[in-house]
Amino acid sequence: MANDSEPWPWPDSLDGIVAAPLSHRVLMENDRVRVLDVVIEPGAKEPPHTHKLPGVFIVIAPTRLRYFGAAGELVREYMASTEPRWFDPEPLHAVENIDSTRYHAIRIELKDN
């Protein structure tokens, strides 16, 4: 969120591991971090979901993706990069793998920010 004093507007039921369990799996979690394994099969589109926590995203197997916003609109189409990237909390979105190979990434979410 742009302003940390604003409350998170989405319910916990939209968290990636709840709303999109086929593509998000918890590898490890403690009071400081949550590590997610993110896999999107070829041709699959995730259900809309959020990520309340900021963190680092590391793509292991990049593919071509489509990123959709909260209203279901196409925001961008791109080739995922293997360069580690910082992510702020992500509002409602969905990702579609438009490639012929499996997309695989690790998301390290920081709880104490």
What would you call each of these model-derived segments?
Residues 1-36, 47-48, 67-69, 75-89, ...:
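A short, N-terminal "cap"/entry segment at the start of jelly-roll beta-barrel domains
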Residues 40:
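Conformational-control "hinges and anchors"
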